């Protein structure tokens, strides 16, 4: 019997974690006698509000892609919106099936590279988008705290450790992204350590070549981030897009609330609870924050739904916030893979599909990055120099 590869074992483990969470929720519901109630609640769910939930999910995904699309436009890089949307969905899928969402951004960088987007530019775009999303989430959490202090205080009392940890980790992450974007030496040192580790683990064969490519990507990264720091209006535009994106994602809970026939709580109250839940559970080191999201929903929303509808609301909410992304994202991954295979079979030398960027030589990408930064600035290979000094 052929042994599974390390990647296959990892994928299998992640799938089992997701499946275990589903089974556990159903088991607990059955044990408490809630399955029948959940079934009746789901059958009686109001269709207009289910469509609204699908609409807010679509809004979340469209503005996820819009942030990348606008960033590339700001960098004078014409990436079609459909490419940004497809790659965003691919990234969402891999984020959903890997622990702590660690697989999303690397796959997005790889997908953009296949379409001719320099690695440094796509990396900086994803970093800026991540920074804007986390900032928008924390800012919205702060606003909700001011608007509904009693409701937030009650949630904190119920899940003090979860909420406090979530705020701290999100805040530290934002600060870390800022530090990495500003301080080139820290980033360069981290990359050097990673290359050394890769060499020691026999993952990196040619240290000089790897360092050269990493340095070229680093030049692209800081050139595009520097451009944003010198044009704060552009950064504010990206922040505005992220605010709309977060509102779309957080509004799913209100649509589910109304779909279950509830109307006593105001939109802002449900929004406050959902934002707190997202902040508290987002850094759980399991695929899709499984377990923390479901437990947090019970913890924060138990007073918003009748007991007979709570499990049904949880299942419906989890479908729109997680499983729908898995389904659509998987479709995008399969479609993209099938399209790549089809094009390779048709002609190994075929150009990228219409609308994609031509894949440029590494030297051309370096020149483009240098022009973004300063047309007269010489490109330096600091990583190689660091390697020579250390050796």
Model-derived segments and their meaning:
Residues 65-89, 256-273:
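Membrane-embedded helical hairpins/re-entrant loop segments and their flanking transmembrane helices
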Residues 222, 227-276:
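Transmembrane helical segments that form the transport core of multi-pass membrane transport proteins
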Residues 200-221:
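Short, membrane-interfacial amphipathic segments enriched in basic
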Residues 82-91, 268-279, 308-319:
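Alpha-helical transmembrane segments of multi-pass membrane proteins
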Residues 11-12, 43-52, 226-240:
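Membrane-interface helix starts
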Residues 36-44, 112, 217-229:
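A short amphipathic helical element positioned immediately N-terminal to and/or at the very start
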Residues 1-40, 91-206, 286, 290-391:
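Transmembrane helix-loop-helix hairpins in multi-pass inner-membrane proteins
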Residues 50-54, 81-86, 162-167, 235-240, ...:
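Hydrophobic alpha-helical transmembrane segments
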């Amino acid at each position: 019997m052929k042994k599974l590869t390390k990647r296959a074992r990892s994928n299998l483990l992640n799938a089992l974690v997701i499946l275990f969470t589903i089974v556990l929720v159903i088991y607990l519901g059955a044990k408490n006698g809630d399955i029948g109630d959940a079934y009746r609640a789901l059958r009686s769910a109001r269709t207009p509000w289910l469509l609204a939930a699908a609409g807010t999910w679509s809004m979340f995904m469209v503005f996820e892609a819009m942030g990348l699309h606008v960033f590339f436009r700001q960098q004078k890089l014409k990436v079609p919106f459909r490419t940004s949307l497809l790659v965003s969905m691919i990234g969402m899928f891999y984020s959903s099936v890997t622990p702590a969402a660690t697989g999303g951004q690397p796959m997005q960088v790889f997908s953009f590279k296949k379409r001719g987007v320099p690695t440094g530019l796509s990396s900086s775009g994803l970093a800026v988008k991540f920074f804007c999303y986390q900032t928008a989430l924390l800012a919205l959490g702060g606003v909700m705290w001011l608007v509904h202090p009693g409701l937030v205080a009650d949630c904190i009392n119920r899940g003090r450790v979860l909420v406090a940890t979530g705020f701290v980790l999100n805040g530290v992450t934002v600060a870390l992204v800022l530090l990495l974007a500003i301080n080139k030496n820290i980033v360069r040192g981290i990359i050097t350590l990673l290359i050394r580790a890769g060499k020691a683990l026999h993952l990196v064969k040619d240290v000089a070549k790897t360092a050269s490519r990493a340095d070229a990507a680093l030049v692209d990264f800081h050139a595009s981030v520097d451009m944003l720091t010198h044009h704060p209006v552009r950064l504010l535009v990206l922040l505005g897009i992220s605010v709309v994106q977060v509102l779309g994602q957080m509004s799913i809970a209100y649509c589910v609330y109304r779909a279950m026939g509830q109307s006593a709580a105001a939109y802002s109250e449900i929004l406050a609870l959902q934002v707190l839940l997202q902040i508290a559970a987002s850094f759980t080191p399991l695929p899709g924050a499984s377990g923390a999201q479901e437990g947090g929903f019970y913890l924060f929303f138990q007073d918003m739904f009748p007991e007979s509808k709570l499990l049904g609301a949880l299942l419906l909410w989890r479908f729109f916030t997680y499983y729908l992304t898995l389904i659509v994202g998987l479709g995008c991954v399969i479609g993209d893979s099938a399209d790549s295979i089809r094009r390779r079979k048709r002609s190994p030398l075929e150009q990228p599909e219409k609308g994609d960027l031509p894949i440029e030589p590494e030297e051309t990408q370096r020149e483009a990055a240098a022009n973004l930064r300063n047309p007269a600035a010489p490109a330096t290979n600091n990583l190689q120099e660091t390697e020579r000094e250390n050796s």
